[in-house]
Amino acid sequence: MSFVGGSMISPGGAEANEYNQKKENNPTRGLYIAEDKDGKPQPTVNLMMRHGVRSALEYASSKDLQKALAVRNPELAPHLTFYDAGGHGYATVRVDAGTMVTEFVCIPRPLERSPGVDGGPLRYRVRHEVPLWQAGERPQMRQTVVEGDAGLAV
């Protein structure tokens, strides 16, 4: 069981793709980024890494996550349950004798300082819970979107 986190405040690859993946004459753009139904950029690289090329391209074309997941490659990256190349925030880890719980807490892109003392708005909070497993068994992870919308990350 492992979790990898990136930077809390530095721009990541998903944000860079908004600027370096040009819309014109770029047939591979949909693998990295596409606009949703409201015209906001979405990191289709999350879909590509978890579900495959067809899923990313389907989302870029249809703007429909369910259609994109319907054409997923279930053999791709079976070890990944969550991937957010454009998230900002932090993770907490709690471990006791029977369970490990990791929560990813994501905030909107921090373009300016939050005026409140509460740290500002939340984009999503996703919990990954793994009960203790026995030698020779595979760990079983339960993922729950506790708050917000994790978008293309799940």
Each language-model region and where it sits:
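Long, structured stretches of catalytic cores involved in phosphate-ester chemistry, encompassing
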Residues: 1-154
